Amino acid sequence: MKRNPVVAGMFYPADYHELLEMIEYCYLSPRGPKELPSKRGNYTKPLGIVSPHAGYIYSGPVAAHGYKKISENVSGEVTAIILGPNHTGLGSGISTMKGIWKTPFGDMEIDNEFADKLWKECDVLDLDENSHLREHSIEVQLPFLKHLEELNIAKFKFVPICMMMQDYETSMDVGYFIAKVAKEMNRKIIIIASTDFSHYEPQESASKKDALVIKDILELNDEEIFTDVVTHNISMCGYGPVIAMVKAMKDLGATNSNLLYYSTSGDVTKDYSEVVGYASILVK
């Protein structure tokens, strides 16, 4: 099927030229990497990132840090595994799908071969379009990837994985099979875990809670990510996708992680009484 965007015109511009201007702003913003991706990288091994999924005016500059790193580490044809939480409650517990997703920059093809093999091997994963039709957490990552295509940095296909179930064991299973299938298919892959961090808390408490989980991610400690989210009641919407990404990346040989940037919505609105946390984190 062809999936139409559901948050174009809301989370990011629906017009090609306005979207291009917005993404360039995200890179050049004081909260962004302050430079545009300028040259094709050289793919040597899988790369993982944590990337936010709010409206671009709030989290786009933070996300740009991760996509700048992607641009420096990819070349040729690359499959992006994009894991996002299910905010809508529609569809199955964990799902992928096949087909094409439309974006203002043009169509984005799913790596149907990878998606098909993954859902057949991973018992917790379903092939289900309904989970994806209204969900924004994966969609908002695609314009950044298509922009890198516009710059001739790489050619991307992707595999969407929407996670309503985010318990520790299930998330670890998803990560295990992503790595297994990537090895079996000898794919060049990147893995994007789409999440925001604390939601609608004062800046001080949000940043303290977020620092706990960020520390766990930097230590590649998938079990502590889950433990801290539960123990400290951290309202991070995509902890399951992050756990799955960390598990997959470790199975693929990752040994280190770096915090690229952390910010909150308060840094944009200047209202620090209720903020949402955003982080860009590199795993390789």
From Swiss-Prot:
InterPro entries referenced in this protein's UniProt entry, alphabetically: MEMO1_fam (IPR002737)
Gene3D superfamilies tied to this protein: LigB-like
Coiled coil segments of this chain: none
Recorded family membership: Belongs to the MEMO1 family.
PANTHER family, sorted: PROTEIN MEMO1 (PTHR11060:SF0)
Annotated NCBIfam families: AmmeMemoSam_B (TIGR04336), PRK00782.1 (NF001987)
Protein name from the UniProt record: MEMO1 family protein MmarC7_0632
Organism: Methanococcus maripaludis (strain C7 / ATCC BAA-1331)
